[in-house]
Structures are given as structure tokens and as C-alpha cells.
Curated annotation (Swiss-Prot):
Keyword Cytoplasm in annotation: yes
Organism, as annotated: Bradyrhizobium diazoefficiens (strain JCM 10833 / BCRC 13528 / IAM 13628 / NBRC 14792 / USDA 110)
Name of the coding gene: prfA
GO cellular component entries: cytoplasm
Protein name, UniProt field: Peptide chain release factor 1
Keyword check for Cytoplasm: yes
N5-methylglutamine: residues carrying this PTM: Q235
Length: 361
């Protein structure tokens, strides 16, 4: 039977009891909200630990009964059946607790900056980028999250050449972080008269929304340019210099924002995206260094990595990182079955973390 860090479990149980006792006292509203949130987060783990310890005690009592020479054959048979039922239940609880004890990504509860760009495939790629955005928008709605478009460049026949949106909701990054990469679509375009299947692609980037304290950006490292916003064909669409282009000189990261008529709002949006991109670039650099010797199955999150194929003629979606195929393309692209892919990716990632812990032990 797999072992658990019993001393750590004792500390968690004591901490939970302390929080419950404190919650019954007179508290400032801010502290009450903080305690309530923490209790909601750790109570499922605490309940699993209590159930596990109760089952372990029950198993020990059962095995003692089986080993007792005074136990008659009928009672021993019943005890053996109970033991055979308890053992796998305890193993399941151990696995559940080990997963719950895994280190949490500090960004998991953050909002998300979602960037989708049409790749190879011309107009079809733009249409597919639009399909992906609506898929995430619907998925977010089902989670009770809010989606706000920050910037959008529409395709000539529909969809988007590029769209950037903020996904606001608790746990948004934890759910969407494995969506970064190249998404490929195979389907027959409406304009295709001979029924040939075309392949096109779009790139998705999921960045945790970060704050000033998360990223140190010096004013001297920024080059800020203002200009008049441009519409299709390059013509100027207003007479004031409301568009903003910000370059982070050390990294070369550039963000341009012109969707609002307000220069102040464009600058705030551009800085928000810039912070997230700088943080993400550093995060990827650190992750790459950590996994140089061990390639994780879930994938590196590299923007150039093809992660998923949506095959419309066959009605299937294949995630290449975990070799999972679902014949539920309409439900996935509608955002309704996307959670099945996300859950499978999360499980695979947790398994990789547990394996790494075991190798390090």
C-alpha cells in the first residue's frame, strides 16, 4: 500500500481545526472571507484524510480478526471479504490525497489573457480562429466566467486574423493553461467545389494575468510610441493619436493597441498584455530549464508545438500530447465537451508530477 506523509497530514488537520475555530469568532469581514475561502479549498482534502484514516483503522481491525485463531470460519470469511473491499478503497484514497498534496501552480487562480492567431491556411485559418474563440467563450460561460475582448482583427470572410481577450474567473488559468500551442483543423471549406479536405491552423496562447508586483518593468526599459489608429487598408480612422505601441527593450516584446478611442485605455490594455507576455516568457524559460532532462507528456506549452487536430469529416478531435481521441467534435467545438480534454490533460500532468516525486524520493 502506498505511503502518505502522516506528519504533514497531522499539520493539515490541526490547521483546518484552527481555521474552523477562528471562523466562529468575531472577525473583520476581510479575514472572514479569507478563512472561508481557505476552508473551502482544503475541506475536501481534510475529509479524504479522515476517511482514509478511518478505513486504515478498520482494515487493521479486520486483519486482526482474520489472524485471531478464535475466529470461526464464517466470521473469517466475512472479514476477508471486507478486507478485499477495503484495500482498493484505501488505495484510491491514497491516490486522491497524493494528488491533492501536489504543489499548486501559484498562477492557477488567476484570470487569463487569451490570444488566438490565424496561422497557415488563409481565410480558412481565420474562420478556424473564430471557431476556437467561440469554443473558449462558451466553455468559459459554462464555468461561470466572464470573457471580455481586448483587441480583435477580423478576417476578410469572417473569423479573426487575431483576437485577444481576457477571461475572468477563479481558476481560469488552471483550466486553460494546457491550451497553448498550435491547433490544426481538417475540413472541406464552403468554397471548395470538389470536396477536397483543406488543412489550416491557428495558434493559441494562454497567459496568466499578472500584476505589477509579479513583473518588475522599469520605465527606462520601455519605448512608448503613439500614432493614429488605422483601419482596413491602412487608412487612419481618427484624427487623434490614440493608438499605442509599447516595446519592452530587454526582451524585444512589442504590444500594439488601438481598439479604444482613448489613448489612456489603450495604454492600460497594452501594459496588461505586456506584463503577461514578459511573465510568460520568463516562466517558459524556467520551465524549459527544469524539464531539460525530462520531457513531460502533457507538452512544453511551446507556441510552435502542434497539440490538437480537429477533423471535421471524421467528427473527431485528437490531442497529440496524450494520444487521446474523442469522436465528439461538435460538442468539443461548441465548448460543451472541451472539459473532457482538459480533465484528461490535467490528470496526465498530475501523473507526471507524481512520477517525478517518486523518482526524486
Amino acid at each position: 500500500m502506498s505511503s502518505l506523509p502522516e506528519a504533514k497530514l497531522d499539520v493539515l488537520l490541526a490547521h483546518h481545526a484552527s481555521l474552523e475555530a477562528e471562523s466562529l469568532g468575531q472577525l473583520a469581514s476581510e479575514r472572514y472571507v479569507q478563512i472561508t475561502r481557505e476552508l473551502a479549498e482544503i475541506t475536501p482534502l481534510i475529509e479524504a484524510v479522515k476517511t482514509y484514516r478511518s478505513a486504515v483503522k478498520e482494515l487493521a481491525d479486520t486483519e486482526a480478526l482474520i489472524a485471531d485463531p478464535a475466529t470461526d470460519a464464517e466470521m473469517r470469511g466475512m472479514a476477508e471479504a471486507e478486507r478485499d473491499e477495503l484495500a482498493p478503497r484505501i488505495e484510491d484514497l491514497v491516490q486522491k490525497i497524493r494528488v491533492a498534496l501536489l504543489p499548486k501552480d501559484a498562477m492557477d487562480d488567476r484570470n487569463v489573457v487569451l490570444e488566438i492567431r490565424a496561422g497557415t491556411g488563409g481565410d480558412e485559418a481565420s474562420l478556424f480562429a473564430g471557431d476556437l474563440f467561440r469554443m473558449y467563450e462558451r466553455f468559459a460561460s459554462l464555468q461561470g466566467w466572464k470573457v471580455e475582448v481586448i483587441s480583435a482583427s477580423e478576417g476578410t470572410v469572417g473569423g479573426y486574423k487575431e483576437i485577444i481577450a481576457e477571461v475572468q474567473g477563479r481558476g481560469a488559468f488552471s483550466k486553460l493553461k494546457f491550451e497553448s500551442g498550435v491547433h490544426r483543423v481538417q475540413r472541406v471549406p464552403d468554397t471548395e467545389t470538389q470536396g477536397r479536405i483543406h488543412t489550416s491552423a491557428a495558434t493559441v496562447a494562454v497567459l496568466p494575468e499578472v500584476e505589477d508586483v509579479d513583473v518588475d518593468i522599469k520605465n527606462d526599459d520601455l519605448r512608448i510610441e503613439t500614432m493614429r489608429a488605422q483601419g482596413a487598408g491602412g487608412q487612419h480612422v481618427n484624427k487623434t493619436e490614440s493608438a499605442i505601441r509599447i516595446t519592452h527593450i530587454p526582451t524585444g516584446i512589442v504590444v500594439m493597441m488601438q481598439d479604444s478611442r482613448s489613448q489612456h485605455k489603450n495604454r492600460a490594455s497594452a501594459m496588461n498584455i505586456l506584463r503577461s507576455r514578459i511573465y510568460d516568457a520568463e516562466r517558459q524559460r524556467v520551465d524549459a530549464a527544469r524539464s531539460a532532462e525530462r520531457k513531460e507528456k502533457v507538452g512544453s506549452g511551446d507556441r510552435s508545438e502542434r497539440i490538437r487536430t480537429y477533423n471535421f469529416p471524421q467528427g473527431r478531435v485528437t490531442d497529440h500530447r496524450i494520444n487521446l481521441t474523442l469522436y465528439k467534435l461538435p460538442q468539443v467545438i461548441a465548448g460543451e465537451a472541451l472539459g473532457e480534454l482538459i480533465d484528461a490533460l490535467t490528470t496526465e500532468h498530475q501523473a507526471a508530477q507524481l512520477a517525478a516525486q517518486g523518482a526524486a524520493a
